[in-house]
Design a protein with these regions (language model features):
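Bacterial N-terminal signal peptides
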Residues: 5-15
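Transmembrane beta-barrel domains of bacterial outer-membrane proteins
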Residues: 23-383, 387-417
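Sec/Tat signal peptide C-region and signal peptidase I cleavage site
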Residues: 16-22
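N-terminal secretory signal peptides that target proteins for export/translocation
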Residues: 1-2
């Protein structure tokens, strides 16, 4: 219990001491030069909505940022597009908007009859008209920034789909604690998780509603259905994601000692994520296999060793005018250890405490966070907690996360099984 208190205190500290002024997702330094007088003016501006930021490149938007701007002035902006450096510019006396992203060799001109029309063409490029060039930009964002909702960081859909397979395969022990397996019949799992994460000046709050169901079959196997829903808020820009996974927990009997139990859990999963504010949308499918080995070292003490390998691949998705392909294929390897100790009773309820550590690593396409670690603890309050006459184990947990490029965060969890 003391260890869990330390995790909670650390999480509160992270929540209260996050960046006072988090970075804007889209920001730039704007400069204009009058073609007649030669006078130059500069200003900075940022937005957390891709369309609002794009509006800064209309005549009205540039005028609001640079009072000396005219429709024939030269205008240049060194910008950060979700962390990817780029340059957008108008030459003097020209309506053509030029986009340059040196890191991936993109140099694209949008030639409208007016600057406002050129800006419209640039927006269409971002909505999916960019084709292969847009895919290169998205892959660069995943590889070099911590805020893409599809992939590249521990809170992206790709990472969360793999983590969900791993967590349900171990009975939720690495998130909210406690194995919900029973000999037969059906059990529902309901939980809530809040997390706060920071990297490279960006802050992200994560709200997750894990939903699950499992059913014990007569042959000792157990059918698993898992459907978590997640809301991410990064610098005020919101992303919504969800996935559905189906798996089978298969007990393995190979003349193991009575103190050992082993199961293999294959799972298939599909999910999607979208954010109008970020201009991002994507879908993924995955297939995973998890091994879970329990060792009852002594009465009241159990160690669980879990190992997972998963293949995750993006799918093209078109939603609300955004047609986007990330073209990513990655392999996720997740390995963890739980130590669980029965602590006794509290108000007539059986209580156990656990500590865990998990290491996650990716291969395949380049990601901003290729490896991260999670350390946590949880308490399980078991029977005889009852709700509406049903026995309902309750789980409280906390997790600290650290990863590549200074990625760090904290989450707190609450879970029920009934």
């Amino acid at each position: 219990m003391r260890s869990l208190g330390l995790f909670l205190a650390l999480g509160l500290g992270l929540s209260l001491t996050g960046n006072a002024q988090a970075r804007d997702l889209f920001e730039g330094r704007f400069t204009t030069t009058d073609p007649i007088s030669g006078v130059t003016q500069s200003a900075s501006a940022g937005r957390n909505n891709v369309l609002d930021f794009a509006d800064l490149f209309t005549d009205a938007g540039l005028k609001s940022t640079l009072s000396g701007y005219t429709p024939i002035s030269a205008a240049t902006a060194s910008v950060s597009l979700r962390g990817v450096p780029a340059t957008l510019s108008y030459a003097a006396n020209s309506p053509v908007l030029r986009l340059q992203i040196p890191s991936i060799g993109i140099d694209r001109s949008f030639n409208g009859a007016t600057r406002d029309q050129s800006q419209d063409l640039a927006v269409e490029w971002l909505r999916g008209g960019g084709g292969a060039e847009l895919t290169r930009f998205l892959k660069e964002a995943v590889a070099t920034t911590p805020v893409d909702p599809v992939a590249g960081n521990p809170n992206s859909l790709m990472s969360q789909m793999g983590a969900s397979d791993f967590n349900v395969a171990t009975g939720g022990g690495f998130t909210a604690g406690g194995r919900s397996d029973v000999a037969g019949g059906g059990r529902f799992d309901l939980g809530a998780r809040f997390g706060r994460y920071t990297a490279d000046g960006f802050d992200t709050n994560v709200y997750t509603l894990p939903l699950g169901y499992s059913y014990g079959l007569n042959n000792g196997m157990r059918l698993i259905i898992d459907a978590p829903l997640t809301l991410l808020s990064t610098s005020g820009a919101q992303s919504y994601s969800g996935s559905v996974g189906v798996g089978l927990r298969i007990p393995i009997s190979v003349n193991l000692p009575e103190s050992l139990s082993w199961a293999l859990i294959p799972m298939m999963r599909a999910g999607g994520v979208g954010s109008v504010e970020l201009g991002a949308v994507g879908g993924l499918w995955s297939a995973s296999l998890t091994s879970a080995l329990d060792w009852r070292a002594r009465e009241g003490t159990t160690f669980t060793l879990a190992n997972m390998a998963s293949r995750l691949e993006t799918m093209s998705v078109t939603i609300s005018d955004f047609g986007i392909s990330y073209d990513l294929t990655n392999y996720m390897f997740r390995n963890g250890l739980i130590a669980t100790q029965r602590l006794g009773e509290l108000a007539g309820r059986q209580v156990s405490g656990s500590l865990f550590a998990v290491d996650t690593r990716f291969t395949g396409d380049d990601l901003y966070v290729k490896a991260y670690q999670e350390y946590g603890g949880y308490l399980t309050f078991g029977d005889p907690v009852t709700v509406a006459g049903m026995r309902v184990p309750i789980r409280l947990g906390a997790t600290f996360t650290q990863g590549d490029n200074g990625y760090r965060g904290f989450s707190a969890n609450l879970g029920f099984t009934f």
